[in-house]
Amino acid sequence: MIEEDYEAWEAYPQYRWVFNKLELSMRLGYDCGPACVPIKNAGNYIIRPTYNLYGMGIGAHKKFLDPSIHGEEMIHHKHIPPGYFWCEWFDGNHQSVDFIKDNNHWVPFHTMTGKHEDKHNLTKFIEWEVTEPEITLPDWLHDITTEKYLNVETRGGKIIEVHLRSGNDMLWDHDVGTKVIPVWKGVNYKEYEHLPFIKNFHPEEHKYEADGNLSDIRLGYYVNKK
């Protein structure tokens, strides 16, 4: 079974556009653009790599931009590094939704809603909860066919990422209301030590470090069942 994005890249060459987050954002009609193209409206934006098959929010950050202040600078790569893009910022819940194909339509069957430690760190979640989905897929996403599953991440009900694999499979057996506390290296979790602990999918810690591109290293999860 396909478990990682790099495996999906090889398995589904016809859908490689999904990994291009700028292309996906444009198809969804968002206000977005690549590095060197200045914004037109003042506001909050998410800045992140156009491609990130590793996941974990590498390089993603929130930034306020104003064309009258930052527009000219953006043309010369200030604020948006090479290989990155900008997109309008969406407030609201961050959800990870797993789908399975039924009668040629993707049907959601498991949803996790996450909370970040703060608005400036888009990697470090402090809690995930099994919830109901808040999403309607555009018709063209139903045309995608995978081995079995599709995972879609949203913020405020807006699609921000599509993965040609499952995303929540380690937690499928838990009911709505179950809370999951990510365990980050160097943080004291004494208050949760009485709860069941789930290790990361990969036992090797280095597989969650991105060769130094991640400063927050997840070790696993504590599960607080409903």
Could you tell me what each predicted segment is?
Residues 55-56, 104-107, 115-121, 126-226:
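ATP-dependent carboxylate activation and anion-phosphoryl transfer catalytic cores
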Residues 2-138:
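Active-site nucleotide/adenylate-binding loops and adjacent lid/helix of ATP-dependent enzymes
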